[in-house]
Every structure is written in C-alpha cells, then in structure tokens.
Amino acid sequence: FYLVMILDVYSRKIVGWEVFHAESAHHASLVIRRAVLAEGLIDQPLVLHADNGSPFKGATLLETLHALNITPSYSRPRVSNDNAFSEALFRTCKYVPGYPVNGFDSLQAAQRWVQDFVLWYNTEHRHRAIRFVTPAERHRGEDRAILAQRHALNQAAREAHPERWSGKTRN
C-alpha cells in the first residue's frame, strides 16, 4: 500500500492524505486537489515540496499543480535534510504505539489506521517543533493565546514560589 500525505509546514498539520494500492501521479494529484479544496486555498500561491519520486514529477501531477497555482519544489539529490519535515512525519507515523509492525491485512485496514493516526496527530499530539501545541491549534491560529496563557501560568507559579525556580522556563 502507498500513503500520500500533505503536510502544512507552518502548522505541521496533515491537510490531506490517502492510502492507495499503487503509487501514481494521478493518486498524488487527487490528494493535492482534495487538500487545496478542503483548506479553501483555490487560487492561493502555494508551494508543494516533494522528493524526486516519479509520482511527484509526472505530467498528471504537474498539470494539477499548474491548474491550482502551486509551485513545485523538489529535494536536491544527496541532500539528506531537504525533506526533513516529511521524513519526521513518516517516522512519527511508523513509531507511534499501535503501528502494525507486520503490515496491514487490507487497504481498508490501512485507511482506517491512517485516519485514526491523522486525527491523533492533528488534534492530540503536542508537537515539540511548534512549542507543544497541536498542529490543529496552530493551524487555526490558537497557538498564540495558548502560549500566552501558558506563560502567564508559569509566571504566576514563579512569583508564588520563587524557590522552586532556578532559571528560565522553556517554551
């Protein structure tokens, strides 16, 4: 089975995904088109960064990107950190508790598992790179209020018990 996921780099939210029997530019195009529509980003200037795999360089996908005003960007050969966000996401996916180490019995089982993973990742997973808010909170713009509230709570605790604090608080 082949998983296509679209990640918003700013918020780390998975904005599109699908599991297919085969890898193809047509399948990648479907996921991108759905994500753009679901996020309300028609005619917005976007950039899609992908590896150099054939599904993301095929004519079908390039036509879709052009039609949606999306600029393609590709990883450079032999530059390991060009696709770091995607690599980190897939690592999280494969190492989350409950990942079936022996694979999936069916396409439907894979789709159900990924659906549950995406829901967890977007709405429950407190992401270290975005200061321990969820990707959905950051995507909706709620992170600033959450971080301000967290900071105020830490400041109040510090003022109430300064002996418990030896330095600055982390994010």
Regions found by a protein language model. Give the residues of each.
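Charged DNA-binding/catalytic regions of mobile-element recombinases
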Residues: 1-171
